[in-house]
Amino acid sequence: MKNTTEEKREAIPNSVSRMLLAGIGVLLQVLWIFWLALKLNDYSTAIQVCTSVLTFLITLRIYGLHINSAYKISWIILILLFPIFGLTIYLLFGRSGAVSVMRRRFGRNMTMLRQYHVPILQQRRALPYPDRITRNHARYLQDRAGYPAYDNTDVTFYGDTCEALEAQKTALRSAEKFIFMEYHAIEDASAWQELEDILAERAAHGVEVRVFYDDVGSIGFINSKFVKKLAGRGIQCRRFNPVIPILNVFMNNRDHRKITVVDGRVGFTGGYNLAEEYFNRTHPYGQWKDSGIRLEGDAVRGLTLIFLELWGATQKAAPEVERYLPDVPYTAQENAVVLPYADNPLDDEATGENVYLNMIRSAKDYVYITTPYLILSDEMQRTLRLAASSGVDVRIITPGIPDKKLIFSVTRSYYASLAKSGVRIYEYAPGFIHAKQCVADGTEAVVGTINFDFRSLYLHFENACWFCGCSAVADVRRDFDALFPVCREVTQEYADTRSLAVRGWDCVLRLFSPLM
């Protein structure tokens, strides 16, 4: 592991101005609403009564929602302590969902795309699962989330994102029909430029190229002319949920997915975005650690359909689907079962969290986890503690150098209760670990975009891939084995009794952590 130093990242000036304009616009509107509510509250007893009634009704509504209890409690306490401020913030940012147009389009897309999952769901009941446990885990994703499992697929794991990037470039150069790319963050710098040049060359040869990025995730990396620049090179490009200086409930729900699909035969996903730091070309937080996977074979169909979920939701007409689901002849080298899946904030199914919970609950020997942020629900905490208390080797790796110091403090506030139950906590000493991966008992693994925090599990559009019965599972385990020696284990430090002040501060952080 080479030594690196922290470097400041320079933001794109145009992006900074957009971010400031949007932030100032939203802040002014929030302050105006807050000021108006205070004035009205002082002006009339009737207004005070209405505020109290509204506070009571909203509190009841939150309590009755089918969402995580910690999330509900945090909002209820905020509203009861600061009624006007709490109500304003909750009505603006506290509800998972979308404006009616986006919700309608997304629902239309999901209904239509499910039709393409159904034949696979019906055909793939007798796949070569290693055991009953993995079969049941796949069954959950198929029966509840609606995403089918596939065989005839080879999985390649990359613990080094530079290797993943090179494999991605090789696949892109071979494209003959279409390329789909969806990422939370794209930085218009050297790594992206290498990809863009390949995309433009393929587009010039008649390949349909689509690029889709989240506007908030990319706002510090690219300027407002990025979409036009790509269009000038023959590349279709769209922004998800553009930043505007107007209050919008849906602004809280971001596209955190990372997907590349080439001709429906090769696909990539994982934790890394297409920005310099993800490939250690810059070092804003020391050495960057991330991971990803390459799929080749039938399961790429699943990634294609996941891409079309949000791409189609940004247009009025229903997206064309069948032409992007070619029957590609392929014979896999291993008997893997591969299941690409996604999660979204517009339903009541916490798919991403439930996959993790299933793996932890059924682990017999070990379960290893990496996550950049550790903000856990009560259920997740109990599950991790119970597994460790039952003799399972539970280990979690978090960053050694944080990208967000407040969130890092929140992450550390969860260490003590976990460590006292036997969960082993490690911090990645060389820098920032951004990988989102989990492996259990050497039989199954997940690699994707889903962090162990509330935003990933409840508010964002996410995707991941669960797989078993292939050498990639062992490769994920080997990646963990290489990580532990360069990490600093802090288990005992947090298992020991700490001062009352520290414990009190941790309680405050955890109380409002679901809102971060």
For each feature predicted by the language model, list its residue ranges:
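Active-site donor-binding acidic/aromatic loop of nucleotide-activated sugar
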Residues: 425-429
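Helical hairpin unit composed of two closely spaced alpha helices linked by a short loop
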Residues: 363, 373-395, 399, 404
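N-terminal localization/anchoring segments of enzymes in phospholipid and broader phosphate metabolism
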Residues: 1-354, 358, 362, 402, ...
